[in-house]
Amino acid sequence: MNILEYPKFIRPLISVFLCIASIFLSLAGRPTIPHGRELDMSKFELTWSDEFDGDKLDLTKWDGHYYSDGDTIIRRGSYWNNSLATVSDGSLHIATKYYPDGLNGNGKPGWYTSGIDTSRSYEQQYGYFECRCILPKGTGLWSAFWMFCSGVGKLDHDGELGAEIDIYESPYYHLEGVDGNSVASNIHINGYGEEHRTKSVCHSRVTANNPYEEFNTYGLEWNEKGYIFYINGVEAGRTRFGVSEVPEWMILSVEVDGANGEPADGWA
């Protein structure tokens, strides 16, 4: 995973790229193949990275999202615990497992997985953020690489106080054919109540490699004018909606569809 920022002397220009066919397909709810500009990495400088070397999660960089190391919390249809996030062979592995007696016999039977973030160690405003990953295979599994800050819950703003930036989300394994090989990129602002506002930026097919078997790269270029989303270095979508003007931290997570620790009906 690499995080970069613009050198101070660079002010990238945002150009508008429109494709009528792509717009029609998006409105129909079908994923589209990324077709925009290629990512220009020459305008960035590396500021942070984790190659997941070694044999355990680096806790100087990562902590549990909404929980501390060793704790267990309910997250939608499962439980989150850091023990399900392990490191080996130069990769982070977030497992999803069923424990009939609960994790370590804690009396909470159910599915367990994990979500980790950099909230205590690193945050950044503007730049390029990416992860290279294989998506989890399973109906009801929902992996994501996203950004967040405390201002997301604040109301009466247009994103400048903070936004949930979903660089990629992968809830589509259950779909048949090529539609299942897709991810979504979304923006959320103004909390999650009645004043919540959201923008679905793109629903993209992943075509270079099978996303459930091979690595692909999912990236975000974020600047003062907007967000540009990339898959394998090719633009998938862009928006000026809800541009955050504050530093945000990164999250890597897997969730099980459902609520209160119970999977949704039909999940298997």
Model-derived segments and spans:
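Accessible peptide chain termini
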Residues: 1-2, 23
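Short intrinsically disordered, low-complexity coil segments enriched in acidic
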Residues: 2-3, 57
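Bacterial N-terminal signal peptides that target proteins for export
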Residues: 3-16
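Bacterial Sec-dependent signal peptides at the C-terminal "C-region" and cleavage site
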Residues: 17-37
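GH16 jelly-roll
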Residues: 30-268
